[in-house]
């Protein structure tokens, strides 16, 4: 009995430590998400072609940051202001807004499971801090752009999403097309960049404007992959 308990504890510790070790290895390579793995295991279609961030139109990372995580360049993995806003909303009984940073979404997509739960958030927070510590901002964004789901039929990553929506590579996206792709996150099965409705088009226009803000312009200057230099 004691041996079984020790084995169970050891297994849990290994599972908890594995993401931290794998993060060190993910400074290079082309990792896949847990959702992609699950889809493969269930026989669902998965389409993904990895594209280095230098080969992606700068308009896409710019509008993704503008839409998903405006403080991406300045926070250390977690946007504590957004966390406090979510807590305030919960205390006031209001519907909570999404407060996850791009780094947190990378942690979730690479190592955890979809859906909302306190357990997942408890695992996600330290992972996001670790990812930000050991990987560059450019690499974090590159991972995100290549593992996010971007289409209704198993299109993962910017390349598959761009090909599905516009019939062109991620490197050829215009600012408007990039904004439409950013606007369907994180719900590519209910929103469409290929046939955008009024709401998606309105979001896209908002994100194009946000990407031109002074704060994000500073972010682009500090990160060559975003500035197109």
From Swiss-Prot:
Keyword line: Cell inner membrane, Cell membrane, Cell shape, Cell wall biogenesis/degradation, Glycosyltransferase, Membrane, Peptidoglycan synthesis, Transferase, Transmembrane, Transmembrane helix
InterPro entries xrefs: Glyco_trans_51 (IPR001264), Lysozyme-like_dom_sf (IPR023346), PBP_transglycosylase (IPR036950), Pep_trsgly (IPR011812)
Protein location: Cell inner membrane
Protein origin, superkingdom: Bacteria
Entry's EC annotation: 2.4.99.28
Transmembrane segments: 7-27
Pfam families: Transgly (PF00912)
Membrane topology of the entry: Single-pass membrane protein
Pathway terms, separated by semicolons: Cell wall biogenesis; peptidoglycan biosynthesis
Catalytic reaction equation(s): [GlcNAc-(1->4)-Mur2Ac(oyl-L-Ala-gamma-D-Glu-L-Lys-D-Ala-D-Ala)](n)-di-trans,octa-cis-undecaprenyl diphosphate + beta-D-GlcNAc-(1->4)-Mur2Ac(oyl-L-Ala-gamma-D-Glu-L-Lys-D-Ala-D-Ala)-di-trans,octa-cis-undecaprenyl diphosphate = [GlcNAc-(1->4)-Mur2Ac(oyl-L-Ala-gamma-D-Glu-L-Lys-D-Ala-D-Ala)](n+1)-di-trans,octa-cis-undecaprenyl diphosphate + di-trans,octa-cis-undecaprenyl diphosphate + H(+)
Originating organism: Rhodopseudomonas palustris (strain BisB5)
Molecular function GO labels: pentosyltransferase activity; peptidoglycan glycosyltransferase activity
Primary role: Peptidoglycan polymerase that catalyzes glycan chain elongation from lipid-linked precursors.
Name under which the protein is recorded: Biosynthetic peptidoglycan transglycosylase
NCBIfam families from the UniProt entry: mono_pep_trsgly (TIGR02070)
GO cellular component terms attached to this protein's record: peptidoglycan-based cell wall; plasma membrane
Similarity comment: Belongs to the glycosyltransferase 51 family.
Entry's Gene Ontology BP terms: cell wall organization; peptidoglycan biosynthetic process; regulation of cell shape
């Amino acid at each position: 009995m004691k041996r079984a308990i020790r084995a169970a504890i050891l297994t849990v510790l290994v599972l908890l430590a594995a993401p931290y070790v794998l993060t060190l290895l993910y400074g290079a390579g082309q990792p896949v998400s847990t959702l992609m793995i699950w889809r493969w295991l269930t026989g669902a279609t998965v389409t993904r072609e990895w594209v280095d961030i230098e080969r992606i139109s700068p308009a896409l990372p710019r509008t993704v940051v503008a839409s998903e995580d405006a403080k991406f360049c300045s926070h250390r993995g977690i946007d504590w202001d957004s966390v406090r806003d979510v807590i305030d909303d919960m205390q006031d009984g209001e519907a909570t807004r999404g407060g996850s940073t791009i780094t947190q979404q990378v942690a979730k997509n690479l190592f955890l499971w979809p859906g909302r739960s306190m357990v997942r958030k408890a695992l996600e927070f330290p992972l996001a801090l670790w990812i930000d510590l050991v990987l560059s901002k450019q690499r974090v964004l590159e991972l995100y752009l290549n593992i996010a789901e971007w289409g209704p039929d198993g299109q993962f990553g910017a390349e598959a999403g761009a090909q599905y929506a516009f019939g062109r590579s991620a490197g050829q996206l215009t600012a408007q097309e990039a904004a439409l792709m950013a606007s369907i996150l994180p719900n590519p099965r209910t929103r469409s960049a290929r046939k955008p409705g009024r709401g998606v088009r309105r979001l896209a226009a908002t994100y194009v404007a946000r990407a031109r803000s002074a704060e994000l312009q500073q972010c682009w200057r500090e990160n060559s992959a975003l500035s197109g230099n």
